[in-house]
Regions:
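Charged catalytic cores and adjacent phosphate/nucleic-acid-binding surfaces used
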Residues: 1-36, 42-59, 73-86, 97-237
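A glycine-rich, hydrophobic loop/mini-helix early in the fold
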Residues: 63-74, 92-95
Length: 237
């Protein structure tokens, strides 16, 4: 079984560690793929990130992907239009309008921490149905738990449980990510699975959330970069 962590921040965004440090640590922990989530600042930044990833790729066996995390609906639309230029499109969750826009947008791969800074889970039954229809994975973010304390952590855990309950009922995809900003915050995949079980996921679905679900996202990213690709589900001969 291959394991993936598709939401990690390097020093290029809000992170503290280099791409190489994070990639090497992820490889040690048993991951086969890691995706660096950055904030889009333009074409020059994108090319610089690709060069840094290529440099780190030569020093590790793990496959390194590039993702961009949209922070508002305007940024989301812009990134959706240029998605073939990178691998994974993430939407920064928390704001209800952003959460809704993310699950309505087919180009979005992951809605990150939809419960962020909220007193509810950030997703309702309508949004859950949209997430399923558009294959938008709802994230369970380990860092949200790791860096919180007391009542805040209790609220976050309760909100994550609510999203897992919605996922069970409406079949929306759930993905487990570390959300790490340092190579010391990366979490091994089996610990992530164990955490998801404690939140109410059955073992099979918890494993899929760190393997099968992200693998589909990676496969879709590779297909999209093919010269034969026209749109999702449509290719030239």
């Amino acid at each position: 079984m291959r394991f993936f962590d598709l939401h990690v921040h390097s020093a290029f965004s809000e992170g503290e560690s280099t791409i190489e440090q994070l990639a090497k640590r992820a490889e040690e922990l048993g991951y086969s793929n890691i995706c660096f989530s950055e904030y889009y600042e333009g074409r020059a930044q994108l090319e610089k990130l690709k060069a840094e990833i290529a440099k780190a790729q030569r020093k590790t066996k793990i496959e390194i992907l590039l993702g961009f995390e949209a922070r508002n609906t305007r940024e989301l639309k812009r990134l959706a239009d240029i998605k073939r230029m990178f691998d994974v499109l993430l939407a920064h969750g928390g704001d209800l309008r952003m959460n809704r826009a993310a699950v309505e947008t087919k180009e979005v791969d992951i809605l990150t921490h939809p419960e962020h800074k909220r007193y509810d889970c950030g997703v309702n039954h309508i949004m859950a149905k949209l997430a399923k229809r558009n294959n938008v994975a709802i994230e369970i973010n380990f860092r949200e738990i790791l860096t919180s304390t007391k009542k805040t952590r209790s609220r976050i855990l309760a909100n994550m449980r609510d999203n897992i309950t919605l996922a069970k009922k409406y079949k929306m995809p759930i993905i487990l990510c570390s959300g790490a900003i340092s190579h010391w915050e990366l979490c091994d995949p089996l610990s992530m699975v164990s955490m998801a079980e404690q939140l109410g996921m059955i073992l099979k679905h918890a494993k899929e959330a760190v393997s099968k679900i992200p693998e589909k996202i990676v496969k879709s990213a590779k297909e999209r970069k093919s010269k034969k690709w026209i749109m999702p589900g449509v290719k030239t001969r």
